[in-house]
């Protein structure tokens, strides 16, 4: 939701290609989607990734309000190690600088967090998406 750093999006595109997980991006972006930093971080994986782009939160939500959604935030009440990530169709991450806004968090979906040191503010977005993606895959691993 509202990506601000092109390199993080490129890294998430590459992650999508390598894991087979879909990546859904919600505008507005803080950069041009054609920006070279996206290409550089995503290398040549763009054609191998499953990426959907929504014009805004309302478009995403109206198409998916019947789906099981969770939010990822430092404000989360449950950490991802204790959550069953299989329950969710979508996992929403907020903007890099400020996280998810209160009006979206107020939608009362489960809000999860990634465990980190108490004196840390946040984890880089691309790293956070990678951690949660691989925890989801780990929970679904069957030899």
Where are the regions that the model predicts?
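Post-transcriptional modification and biogenesis factors for structured RNAs
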Residues: 1-143
């Amino acid at each position: 939701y509202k990506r601000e750093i092109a390199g993080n999006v490129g890294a998430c595109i590459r992650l999508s290609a390598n894991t087979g997980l879909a990546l859904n991006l919600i505008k507005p972006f803080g950069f041009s989607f054609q920006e070279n930093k996206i290409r550089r971080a995503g290398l040549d994986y763009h054609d191998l990734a499953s990426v959907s782009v929504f014009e805004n939160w309302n478009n995403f939500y109206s198409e998916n309000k019947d789906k099981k959604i969770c939010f990822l935030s430092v404000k989360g009440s449950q950490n991802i190690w204790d959550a069953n990530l299989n329950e969710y169709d979508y996992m929403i991450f907020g903007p890099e600088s400020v996280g998810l806004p209160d009006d979206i968090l107020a939608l009362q979906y489960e809000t999860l967090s990634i465990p980190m040191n108490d004196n840390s503010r946040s984890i880089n977005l691309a790293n956070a998406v990678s951690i949660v993606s691989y925890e989801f895959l780990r929970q679904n691993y069957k030899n």
